[in-house]
């Protein structure tokens, strides 16, 4: 299973003041806070760790169908600047991140899905939410169809009762785990192949 998350750094700077009293305490473990405060770029590290938590949470949700908000129960560990792990209730997830011009993008996966997925992060052509969602859906369907040599017209995305997107070939649910994300001017997808 896989999950992803991204942060538009300009929008995050407008929406969240990570330096305000209590922000770090509410979202990050003491080890994570130490990592942030000792970092050469604390702002980047805050959003890197956050995207690791969110992407791993999406995998956990697909596996356990159990929603919760307890960010400190998601413990991040950076192995390299762009690779790490997240531990959630004794389940270990691996992450790979891209720190780009204006964004941080992370994909989380279980060990057996490492390097077995398509992933793409892109800048939107418009700022309208509905158009952004449509553009993201079109991109994931086109990439999946191209990889598997399927006609894209037969593929569709529907959300289940938990709001998790699922991929269909006609009326048949496909077992390929995938995840969509967008924030501000950026969108991304990852899908098992």
What are these regions (language model features)?
Residues 1-193:
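Core catalytic alpha/beta fold that binds nucleotide/phospho-ligands
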């Amino acid at each position: 299973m896989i999950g992803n998350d991204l942060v538009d750094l300009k929008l995050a700077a407008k929406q969240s003041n990570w330096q305000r009293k209590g922000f770090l305490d509410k979202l990050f473990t003491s080890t994570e806070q130490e990592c942030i405060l000792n970092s050469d770029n604390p702002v980047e590290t805050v959003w890197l760790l956050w995207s690791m938590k969110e992407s791993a949470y999406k995998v956990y949700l697909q596996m356990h169908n159990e929603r919760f908000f307890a960010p400190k129960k998601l413990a991040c560990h950076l192995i390299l600047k762009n690779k790490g792990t997240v531990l959630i209730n004794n389940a270990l997830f691996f992450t790979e991140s891209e720190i780009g011009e204006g964004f941080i993008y992370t994909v989380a996966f279980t060990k057996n899905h490492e390097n077995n997925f398509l992933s793409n992060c892109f800048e939107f052509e418009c700022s309208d939410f509905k158009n952004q969602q449509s553009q993201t859906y079109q991109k994931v369907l086109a990439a999946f169809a191209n990889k598997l040599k399927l006609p894209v017209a037969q593929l569709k995305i529907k959300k289940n009762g938990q709001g998790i997107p699922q991929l269909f070939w006609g009326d048949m649910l496909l077992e390929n785990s995938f995840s969509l994300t967008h924030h501000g001017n950026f969108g991304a997808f990852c899908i098992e192949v």
